[in-house]
Amino acid sequence: MNIVIISVVRDFAMYEKCIRTNPYCRGCEFAPIDNREMNAGIPVGYNSFLASRSANEDAWYVFCHEDWQPLENLGERLVDLDRESLWGGIGASTRVRWGIYHQWQLVGTVEECRKDGSNRRMIGCAVSTGTPVETFDCQCLIVHSSLIQRNALRFDEHLTFDLYVEDFCIAAKEKGIASRILPLSACHWSGGSVQPRYYEQERYVNEKYPNECFTGTSSWVLGGRPSILRMASVKVKTLFRKIREC
């Protein structure tokens, strides 16, 4: 079984630790995309990778952040997965109540910590393999090459560093492709804050999919809300995290 790990990289020290020298990635093909000079949006790098591959390739593609660290053997975990679905370790789902209230939930689990390894903690809720979600977090998306080629799936390059995997999931859903959780032990070395660009990119996704209720795993963002409430939801979650860290 062929597995290709694709990462857009600016911090090669972090990439080496989390991906290239990680024993749980042994046997995988590494496809790092050097982004130190261009600082292009991550979808640009991912799409350039897809354009470079054979249309007949038979492989699992693991699109992941440079600071996403698998903690169990990828090859063993991808055996017998349904090639007709998208897969990821952590995502989000919503339940709409009374047509207006959106109940939000993280689905799947991942450890996360700061860049220096401090404040390590588990987030999300454990679920069984194949549990459906609406969207995955951008830290990791697993998809078979045949599904991408057959459905002409690509990443939206307007979304530079946020929500590009969420967008990918929604676009795939419109083609009848489900997003499902693969329980996978991993650590995301990124406890960063929400940047101002996030709100512009979130507005873009809302306009692109006006009838979709999408969820942003890192920020509690729900499609369809007034912008002031979306921004408030981010600030509330950030406050709760700071309180927990004290």
Question: Residues of each region from the PLM?
Answer:
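Active-site donor/metal-binding and catalytic loop motifs
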Residues: 180-205
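A recurrent flexible, glycine/aromatic-enriched loop bordering the glycosyltransferase active site
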Residues: 120-143
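Short, well-formed alpha-helical segments that are part of the catalytic scaffolds
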Residues: 5-27
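Non-catalytic, C-terminal membrane-associated alpha-helical segments of glycosyltransferases
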Residues: 196-215, 219-246
